[in-house]
């Protein structure tokens, strides 16, 4: 393995552990919560310069949720998983994501118009 891959893998496991340590009681299965945290950690390692959980801000979370919406088919997740991920990450990081992704109703034109592009 190349050194960069080893460093990214190490950072990935550190982020997963930091996020798991902050996890409180969830209303869905712990296995699902862990898989959502692992997906978030993979995103952070591959697409951001975040070194620890303390570096994650609202802008990073918004970009992640947009990434989920654009790539949900490739990632094999559905809208329920995305909504769970939003609640989980918002709760873990004390990040408030007030934008159109919180509303999954059919009347949310902004959400569904961005998916058609």
From Swiss-Prot:
Keywords for this protein: Cytoplasm
Task of the protein: Required for swarm cell differentiation. Plays a crucial role in regulating the degree of cell flagellation.
Name under which the protein is recorded: Swarming motility protein SwrAA
UniProt organism field: Bacillus subtilis (strain 168)
Chief site of localization: cytoplasm
GO biological process: positive regulation of single-species biofilm formation
One GO cellular component term: cytoplasm
Taxonomic lineage of the native organism: Bacteria, Bacillati, Bacillota, Bacilli, Bacillales
Family matches, as InterPro entries: SwrA (IPR035388)
